[in-house]
Structure formats: structure tokens, C-alpha cells
Amino acid sequence: LCDKKIQLGINLTKGLGAGALPDVGKGAAEESIDEIMEHIKDSHMLFITAGMGGGTGTGAAPVIAKAAREARAVVKDKGAKEKKILTVGVVTKPFGFEGVRRMRIAELGLEELQKYVDTLIVIPNQNLFRIANEKTTFADAFQLADNVLHIGIRGVTDLMIMPGLINLDFADIETVMSEMGKAMIGTGEAEGEDRAISAAEAAISNPLLDNVSMKGAQGILINITGGGDMTLFEVDSAANRVREEVDENANIIFGATFDQAMEGRVRVSVLATGIDSCNDNSSVNQNKIPAEEKNFKWPYNQIPILETKEYASTE
């Protein structure tokens, strides 16, 4: 999957996992942080992907994000000035069947991670049921989620590297994503009549994302990709369809790129940042949580090891 892999916390974990303990994941990342930073220290942009609720993702992701935030990447421009690494978190939340405790641990991990990333995109695994049917295999469901992320992130990078009539660079990306908090990302692809509108509507209604609304977005990045047959009117209609969903004062950055492999089709990718989170849509039934537990919040570094209610009541 990647050219360079780093084993976290060799001394701490002895080659094993974190045992679903965030403190172990945190310690493993801290043990290996110098090696991690050696690989990312000169990066302009960093994507941190993790599954929240377990040990490694919940514990290690915030450590890496914090180190990246404190680092400075030397940008070789006119003044060779130093700029921080633009850090984007792309993480998942547990399935409902994984239990209340794991969901609460995930939420604590998200709170910690959000302190250090510029932009955070959250995908609840439970939302895979929105796009699955009775015949969808377990592996296929995860592949669908991976594809949404891959195409959406590619929409961001394509703006910087793909040729087009309206080209953008990293400075534009940084404007939309730096210090923006929660975000949503979506992509849609269509062909035939009204393909541009259909692609735009698919992009702004990503069923996998956490309950978030584009209405309050502070920054919007729109990338429209098509073949040589993509028309000006199609670009206009797709961009306007996305614009209708956001506040008129939002900072909208737009790009259009060409890809000969897209002949006959149009793809629209949307990244909305600085959005307000709606009610949490986790599958955990809050009515089933005892009142004393519902109002109780564990400090991030004091998440209990045992899952029993008796253990929690003694803390």
C-alpha cells in the first residue's frame, strides 16, 4: 500500500498491537515519533487516516497530528520561508454493534485529534448500511467507503497536478483547509443527459459522512473533471448547483481539469470546510445509557481498560 512503513513502538508493544488501549497506541507513537517525523518533516500536506475507537488509531493519530502541527516544513520559494504542514485527518467511527464503550472512546479520540489537525473528515462505519443491501459483502462495503475517500482526496490533489482551463495550486488548497475544523468531502460521476447536474448532486449528498451540513461551510473547494467533450454550460451548471447549497459569504475556490479517460462522463468533487456538526448520528441509543454514564466523560489519558459497568462505577 505504501513505499515506506514504520512499526510503531517496537519496545512497548513487542511487535503486537495496542490491545484496544489508546494509551498503548499513544505510547507507541511517542516512542517512534522521531522516525515518523524524519519521513514527513518536509511535507507540505499530510493526510492522517485512522480507525477511531481502538488502541492504535485513537492513541497514535493525535500524537502524529500534534508533532506535524509543531513541525515546520521548509518551502523552497522566493524567501525560502517556513510554513506549517497542512494536516488533514480522515478517520472512521465504529459500527453500532461494537458497543457504547468503543464509541465513547472514539469520540474522545476525535476530540483530541481535532485539536491538532487543520481539517477533520469523519466517516461512521455504521453509515455503510446506507449504501449496502442484503447481498453486499463485508469486504465490498469497506471497498465502497475506501473509493469515496480515494476519489474525494484525488479531487483535491488533481487540482494541483492535472492540466485544466482553471488551474489551482497549493496556496488555494491551503486557504480552504487551514485551521478549518470539521469538513465533508464528496464526489459524484455521471454520464448521459444532465450528467453535470447529476454528478454535482451526488457529490453534495455523500451518505457515508457524519451528520454534517454544507450550509454553514466557510470554505468550498469544487473540482470538475471531464473529457474534451465537457462544455462550458456543464461546468457552469455543476458549479452553481454546489453553490446553491452554501452560504453566499463562503470562500469558494473552483477548478476544472481535463482527463481524456473521462470522455463522455463528468466527475464533480466537493470539499466543504469549517462546517457545523449536526446532531451526532452514531447508532448508539442514548436512551439506553444510564444517566450517570451519559453525563460522565473520561479524560483522554484515563480511559478505563475494563468494559464492565462495575469497573466504571468504582472510578
Swiss-Prot record:
Family to which this protein belongs: Belongs to the FtsZ family.
Organism: Wolbachia pipientis
Positions that bind GTP: 55-57, 98, 102, 146
One of the Pfam families matching this protein, by short name: FtsZ_C
Subcellular location: Cytoplasm
GO cellular component terms, semicolon-separated: cell division site; cytoplasm
InterPro entries per the UniProt record, alphabetical: Cell_div_FtsZ, Cell_div_FtsZ_CS, FtsZ/CetZ, FtsZ_C, Tub_FtsZ_C, Tubulin/FtsZ-like_C, Tubulin/FtsZ_2-layer-sand-dom, Tubulin/FtsZ_GTPase_sf
Known partners and oligomeric status: Homodimer. Polymerizes to form a dynamic ring structure in a strictly GTP-dependent manner. Interacts directly with several other division proteins.
Protein name, UniProt field: Cell division protein FtsZ
